[in-house]
Curated annotation (Swiss-Prot):
PROSITE patterns: RNA_POL_BETA. It is found in: Plastid, Chloroplast. InterPro entries: DNA-dir_RNA_pol_bsu_ext_1_sf (IPR042107), DNA-dir_RNA_pol_su2 (IPR015712), DNA-dir_RNAP_su2_dom (IPR007120), DNA-dir_RNAP_su2_hyb_sf (IPR037033), RNA_pol_bsu_bac (IPR010243), RNA_pol_bsu_CS (IPR007121), RNA_pol_Rpb2_2 (IPR007642), RNA_pol_Rpb2_2_sf (IPR037034). One of its GO terms (biological process) is DNA-templated transcription. This is DNA-directed RNA polymerase subunit beta. Keywords: Chloroplast, DNA-directed RNA polymerase, Nucleotidyltransferase, Plastid, Transcription, Transferase. In plastids the minimal PEP RNA polymerase catalytic core is composed of four subunits: alpha, beta, beta', and beta''. When a (nuclear-encoded) sigma factor is associated with the core the holoenzyme is formed, which can initiate transcription. It comes from Lolium perenne (Perennial ryegrass). The keyword Transferase applies. It catalyses: RNA(n) + a ribonucleoside 5'-triphosphate = RNA(n+1) + diphosphate. GO terms for molecular function: DNA binding; DNA-directed RNA polymerase activity; ribonucleoside binding.
Length: 1076
């Protein structure tokens, strides 16, 4: 957080800062921590010792560029060099050796793994430590339990039963006496009684037999092992038994870590040193003491709130990468031990590098990381839909993943908003559906304390003494456990000056409660009007007038907006658009001042301090979401520029600001039922003038392989049996030419796969060749890459990737231009979404009093029930801004200045626009914001005045071109023999229970029979029906049941229920008991 000289002013931190800070901590600290844990590998028989040292490790610059890594499907990584020492007899060798490659974060805060941009999102978990809770059993008796959570996520419970005996539950099934556990951890009975506050309770429950079991540590360990492992018989104490117990129990359930040790000391008022990160007998006894105090009413009856952020910690990218590095070093240790054994078998002299160099050992590090990025739930494909998604994705926090919650079992309480989220986690921005409340987004000013894993929020410190001494106020970052001790003034006091504030009573937050107190009692106050919202929520103007559910939809839908070919910044915004675009990395920013020498579509040449710098531009590059990423130069040749100036703009940015949609003229009125149920009526102007036209790039690839007979596949233009029309775009190598326009079913890459013909298929000449010369006749199968349905477009790039002579991959990139059409989804910034239902000629659209036709018609019934009135304020103010040629940037919650501030602003601007343009219809006092408009078909005015305005409308990525789908025949499910589900699998349309009811209601028995049998899972009938249809024969009526019925019968048989069916003839409708 940077502070200006102005009092009460602060700048917003970099939105991608959290990812960069996490990765820097991994490189600077975590690598050294894990290398320090690497044990010395000794082989006493041969007097050899190998060791790695953390001091002075080095990371080389990546050997390839980012763009090459993406195109060639490689990992953008850096080689790690570490100091190593090898003692072989009396020979000591020291060497700096390479132990493998580590993926490197790029300037977007992402990683490139096998050519794909991936990002690691932050995980929020219960912090290690101890948590107490009380609950009532079925008899209404209070049961008190204490849960100890380890750093690995393992749980142990302390509980007091009805007989007032204290147990430790180390798993769901086994419970062990607290005395046995303490003795097994190294305490004798005398030490236990000396270190507890209630020794009489500890002495009351062990009988003579139990006292014998805890006479010594060895007996206690045996007893503990028997109960923990459920082993009977006589056991003998041994070192292997101790090691097994250490591995299965103590390592998993007793390692608290640095954070757990701090939490345990705080909760139980202990003073155990921070470097002692394991659970000690003293911890267990203090935890038991506290539990006894809760049970008998002598302690504080305070249940721990598991959903409070002070009891949570963030596992950032640093923690997750550190775990994987530790895992890779463990594998490296085993690999080096095997290599040492092989060295002695071959009797060769080893060096530190030769112990690590074998191929399998040197790639251990990078394969571990590639597996992690490919399979770990918190490693996600980077969302590159638009600049907003690129900025927001790295700020996500998730409760899901290993050690966390699950979408199906999480309670409402764990999903709900908590008072401790204020200024840390956005109360609005979360996913819809099963994961609602489990994935969130960090507030714009929140930062992560990487040392303790807590989320901190900034506040201004208010102190009368400090204010007198110096005019500036200090910004303090408070963690969730600290802000409980402060009186925090709410954001509505921001507008008041110091003199007025001292006389006022202000609303404040204290210990999760809201109070009204005098200004003198305030300790800290908020620093920003919307510091408790995420980036998505902060981009919604007039958010305070919207229902929270609609604001949630809006913040999600802004991330689905497609970058348009001609972007336009919003008339009404919140002021955060510039920072969001800047931190997304899509624009090119000058890193130093200088003079522009030349610009073109690929690069900008800049002269600075006597040097010429070449700044590359992104030119029609495909994103992960198939959008077109393109940068356009914004500086002319010869212009002098300063550091920080925008040189080129990326997709969906204009003038350095985020520009996701278009300002279009909208009317809220019904129109012939075409905007029923959220449908949207649009003007053909939006199509012909390319208002909502977007470009998309599809990637198609094909790879050559070696067949089972050892023959290599071949890329060629010479493909027999194919029409010349399909091959018209191929060059002499058999690959489509750059710039070609391709249609569905055209060949993009010609490929032949050799096949050995079977003897029965030989023609006479082939048999003769084989008999005389012994030559095998081979045939080739055409396996070319063809353009699928809906893929038509222009070829903009072709890439050959050849790793060896036989392994060739060809990638073809095709650019598509998509205008807006019926079936596309559009949305505003207030959760007002809809599907295009009809594109009307502009002369038929309703028009204003000055003759301007409306661009979009929304249903007015979508506003009152959804309670998203912000769209009305936005559209009216947008109209005023369009007429006055103004842009507005309004912070939310402007009612803190005065009542009805939003309404007053909108009406005053409309009145000014009416005066300026001399158009009285812009602001009519009888119905402000509304106007009389005319039907374009008849020229008659509509009966009621209609609300008109300029709204910022987005085109979303849910486009009809990617949704529409048809199937004639295709794959069937193996079990039910019904068509599979989904567009990607060329699946069928499901006719469910309710659809069958509808067809039954119309009495269409034959259609129903076709849908449920012939077209679906009647195996014999569906083969014969095609032939019958072609030849005009009668459709056969088969008597055997469809496959799904047979599956049902088998299911019942597996439950020991026999189900038979009999055909009753038309003549005799009765079946006797004997026949059955």
């Amino acid at each position: 957080m940077l502070r200006n000289g102005n009092e009460g002013m602060s700048t917003i931190p970099g939105f991608s800062q959290i990812q960069f800070e996490g990765f820097c901590r991994f490189i600077n600290q975590a690598l050294a921590e894990e290398l320090n844990k690497f044990p010395a590998i000794k082989d006493p028989d041969h007097e050899i010792a190998f060791q790695l040292f953390a001091k002075g490790y080095q990371l080389l610059e990546p050997s390839i560029k980012e763009r090459d890594a993406v195109y060639e499907s490689l990992t953008y990584s850096s080689e790690l060099y570490v100091s190593a020492r090898l003692i072989f007899g009396f020979d000591v060798q020291k060497q700096t050796i390479s132990i493998g490659n580590i993926p490197i974060m790029n300037s977007l805060g992402t990683f490139i793994i096998n050519g794909i941009y991936r990002i690691v999102i932050n995980q929020i978990l219960l912090s290690p430590g101890i948590y107490y809770r009380s609950e009532l059993d079925h008899k209404g008796i209070s049961i008190y339990t204490g849960t100890i959570i380890s750093d690995w996520g393992g749980r142990s419970e302390l509980a007091i039963d009805k007989k007032e005996r204290i147990w430790a539950r180390v798993s769901r099934k086994q419970k062990i006496s607290i005395l046995v556990l303490s003795s097994a951890m190294g305490s004798n009975l005398r030490e236990i009684l000396d270190n507890v506050s209630y020794p009489e309770i500890f002495l009351s429950f062990p009988n003579a037999k139990e006292k014998k079991r805890i006479e010594s540590k060895e007996k206690a360990i045996l007893e503990f092992y028997q109960q923990f492992a459920c082993v009977g018989g006589d056991l003998v104490f041994s070192e292997s038994l101790c090691e097994e117990l250490q591995k299965k129990f103590f390592q998993q359930k007793c390692e608290l870590g640095r954070i757990g040790r701090r939490n345990m000391n705080r909760r139980l008022n202990l003073d155990i040193p921070q470097n002692n990160t394991f659970l000690l007998p003293r911890d267990v006894l203090a935890a038991t003491d506290h539990l006894i105090g809760m049970k008998f009413g002598t302690g504080i009856l305070d249940d721990d709130d598991m959903n409070h952020l002070k009891n949570k910690r963030i596992r950032s990218v640093a923690d997750l990468l550190q775990d994987q590095f530790g895992l890779a070093l463990g594998r490296l240790q085993h690999a080096v031990q095997k290599t040492i054994r092989r060295v002695f078998i071959r009797q060769s002299k080893p060096t530190p590098q030769t112990l690590v160099t074998p191929t399998s050992t040197s790639i251990l590090l990078i394969t571990t990381y590639e597996t992690f990025f490919g399979t770990y739930p918190l490693s996600q494909v980077f969302d590159q839909t638009n600049p907003l998604t690129q900025t927001v994705h790295g700020r996500k926090v998730s409760c899901l993943g290993p050690g966390g919650l699950t979408g199906r079992t999480s309670s409402f309480r764990s999903r709900d908003i908590h008072p401790s989220h204020y200024g840390r986690i956005c109360p609005i921005d979360t996913s819809e559906g099963i994961n609602v409340g489990l994935t969130g987004s960090l507030a714009i000013h929140a930062r992560i304390n990487h040392l303790w894993g807590s989320i901190e929020s900034p506040f201004y410190e208010i102190s009368a003494e400090k204010a007198k001494k110096k005019k500036s106020r200090q910004v303090v970052y408070l963690s969730p456990n600290r802000d409980e001790y402060y009186m925090i003034a709410a954001g509505n006091s921001l507008s008041l000056n110091q003199g007025i504030q001292e006389e006022q009573v202000v609303p404040a937050r204290y210990r999760q409660e809201f109070l009204t107190i005098a200004w003198e009692q305030i300790h800290v106050r908020s620093i920003f009007p919307f510091q408790y919202f995420s980036i998505g929520g902060s981009l919604i103007p007039f958010i305070e007038h919207n229902d929270a559910n609609r604001a949630l939809m809006s913040s999600n839908m802004q991330r689905q907006a497609v970058p348009l070919s001609r972007s336009e910044k919003c008339i009404v915004g919140t002021g955060l658009e510039r920072q969001t675009a800047l931190d997304s990395g899509v624009s090119v920013i000058a890193e130093r001042e200088g003079k522009i020498l030349s610009t073109d579509s690929h690069k900008i040449l800049l002269s600075s301090s006597g040097k010429t710098l070449s700044i590359p531009l992104v030119n029609h590059r495909r994103s992960n979401k198939n959008n077109c990423m393109h940068q356009k130069s914004r500086v002319p040749r010869g212009k002098s520029i300063k550091k920080g100036q925008i040189l080129a703009e990326g997709a969906a940015t204009v003038g350095g600001e985020l520009a996701l949609g278009k300002n279009v003229l909208v009317a809220y009125m019904p129109w012939e039922g075409y905007n029923f149920e959220d449908a949207v009526l649009i003007s053909e102007r939006l199509v012909y003038e390319d208002i909502y036209t977007s470009f998309h790039i599809r990637k198609y690839e094909i790879q050559t392989d070696t067949t089972s007979q050892g023959s290599a596949e071949k890329i060629t233009k010479e493909i027999p049996h194919l029409e010349a029309h399909l091959l018209r775009n191929l060059d002499r190598n058999g690959v489509v030419r750059l710039g070609s326009w391709v249609e569905t079913s055209d060949i993009l890459v010609g490929k032949l796969t050799p096949q050995i013909a079977s003897e029965s298929s030989y023609i006479a000449e082939a048999g003769l060749l084989r008999a005389i010369f012994g030559l095998e006749v081979s045939t080739s199968k055409e396996t070319s890459l063809k353009l699928p349905i809906g893929g038509r477009g222009r070829v903009i790039d072709v890439k050959w990737i050849q790793r060896d002579p036989l392994d060739i991959m060809v990638r073809v990139y095709i650019l598509q231009k998509r205008e807006i059409k019926v079936g596309d989804k559009v949305a505003g910034r207030h959760g007002n979404k809809g599907i295009i239902s009809k594109i009307l000629p502009r002369q038929d659209m309703p028009y204003l009093q000055d003759g301007t036709p409306v661009d979009m018609v929304f249903n007015p019934l979508g506003v009152p029930s959804r309670m998203n009135v912000g769209q009305i304020f936005e559209s009216s103010l947008g109209l005023a801004g369009d007429l006055l040629k103004k842009h507005y940037r309004i912070a939310p919650f402007d009612e803190r200045y005065e009542q009805e501030a939003s309404r007053k602003l909108v009406f005053s601007e409309l009145y000014e626009a009416s005066k300026e343009t001399k158009n009285p219809w812009v602001f009519e006092p009888e119905y402000p914001g509304k106007s009389r408009i005319f039907d374009g078909r008849t020229g008659d005015p509509f009966e009621q005045p209609v609300l008109i305005g300029k709204s910022y409308i987005l085109k979303l990525i849910h486009q009809v071109d990617e949704k529409i789908h048809g199937r004639s025949t295709g794959p069937y499910s193996l079990v039910t023999q019904q068509p599979v589900r989904g567009r990607a699998k060329q699946g069928g349309q499901r006719v469910g229970e309710m659809e069958v009811w509808a067809l039954e209601g119309f009495g269409v028995a034959h259609i129903l029979q076709e849908i449920l049998t012939y077209k679906s899972d009647h195996l014999i009938a569906r083969q014969e029906i095609l032939n019958a249809t072609i030849w005009g024969k009668r459709i056969p009526n088969h008597e055997d049941p469809p496959e799904s019925f047979r599956v049902l019968v088998r299911e019942l048989r597996s439950l020991a229920l026999e189900l038979n069916h009999f055909l009753v003839s038309e003549k005799n409708f009765q079946v006797t008991r004997e026949e059955v």
